[in-house]
From Swiss-Prot:
Keyword Ribonucleoprotein tagged: yes
Protein name: Small ribosomal subunit protein bS20
Stored Gene3D superfamilies: Ribosomal protein S20
Domain of life of the organism encoding this protein: Bacteria
Region (Disordered): 1-28
Disulfide bonds: none
Gene Ontology biological process: translation
Gene: rpsT
GO MF terms, alphabetically ordered: small ribosomal subunit rRNA binding; structural constituent of ribosome
Record's function text: Binds directly to 16S ribosomal RNA.
Family: Belongs to the bacterial ribosomal protein bS20 family.
Length: 86
């Protein structure tokens, strides 16, 4: 454990940030899973609606630095291709 005051503060801040990021990452993954589930069920309209709900969430997390912008683009491209192929 840290002994210096600033190190203790950084440890507290780091833990808060870790929990916040974990929450956001979990939310984003849930939205992505909803799209995959809709694609698996074969309902194109539900899949497109789920994709439209997921897209701004993923973009926002990429903008804030939670994930890389290329990862966000890859998720969107793969899911959109699956929806289009239905």
């Amino acid at each position: 454990m840290a002994n210096i005051k600033s190190a203790k503060k950084r440890a507290v801040q780091s833990e808060k940030r870790r929990q916040h990021n974990a929450s956001r990452r979990s939310m984003m993954r849930t939205y992505i899973k909803k799209v995959y589930a809709a694609v698996a069920s074969g309902d194109k309209e539900a899949a497109q609606k789920a994709f439209n709900d997921m897209q701004p969430i993923v973009d926002r997390q990429a903008t804030k630095g939670l994930i890389h912008k290329n990862k966000a683009a890859r998720h969107k491209a793969n899911l959109q291709a699956q929806i289009k192929a239905m």
